[in-house]
Design a protein with these regions (language model features):
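Glycan-processing catalytic domains of CAZymes
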Residues: 1-214
Length: 214
């Protein structure tokens, strides 16, 4: 059983101040939520564990223990690349991967390569979703860099999730992924390069998944 992880419940990534200026990430949206007045609305609510920093390894140890106790054995981390560098990696790198019990839980990446708009910003999300703050489209050269980094930093972890000896890698926005290469044929070549690099790193292959979210 796998659970998606939206790694924004931290203030450790400075660039999140664009959306949550108070400095503790998505918790700012949670705390600002009010009762909408319809039957069954249960807001405001306070998290059972409080407004914890999920980039803290001690917090992740607690969450791993809880997830495992309910049968969850894979975390799918939303992973981002904006403005020519990774974004929102703190919860994965500093939280999950430094948790002393992380070998109890497999993990994998879903490259959330959609455009970043004001959707995350409660102050503007109801009025402006057309402005692109960061594009999810990268160049083929950047994608090659992402592949190298992903293989070295994540695939080689003993608890990275695999199917039949192949690391599992997911892409969220298929349209943006194709735009990265320009054509579906070039996109295929990009995936073949990723698979080749993965095999050269000692794996049996690459298990590629795509999300049809539209």
């Amino acid at each position: 059983i796998a659970a998606f992880i939206w790694p924004s419940y931290t203030g450790d990534e400075p660039r999140t101040r664009i959306f949550w200026p108070e400095g503790y990430g998505e918790w700012q949206t949670v705390k600002a939520m009010t009762n909408r007045g319809y039957e069954g609305c249960r807001w405001p609510r306070i998290p059972t564990w409080g407004y914890v920093n999920e980039a803290d390894s001690r917090v992740m140890e607690m969450q791993i223990n809880c997830a495992v106790s309910y049968g969850v054995n894979v975390f799918i981390y939303d992973w981002y690349w904006y403005d020519n560098r990774p974004f929102l990696e703190n919860c994965l790198n500093d939280g999950f991967l430094k948790a002393r019990n992380n070998t109890q839980m497999k993990f994998m990446l879903m490259w959330a390569n959609h455009n970043a708009t004001h959707l995350w910003d409660k102050r503007n999300s109801d009025t402006d979703l057309s402005t692109v703050i960061w594009s999810g489209v990268v160049t083929p050269e950047i994608f090659s860099e992402i592949c190298d980094r992903t293989i070295e930093k994540y695939f080689k972890r003993e608890n990275y999730y695999m199917i039949d000896g192949c690391p599992v890698y997911m892409v969220f926005d298929v349209d943006n992924f194709i735009r990265t290469f320009g054509t579906t044929q070039e996109c295929k070549k990009g995936l073949e390069e990723f698979r080749r690099k993965t095999v050269e790193a000692g794996f049996k292959g690459l298990h590629f998944q795509a999300v049809n979210w539209k």
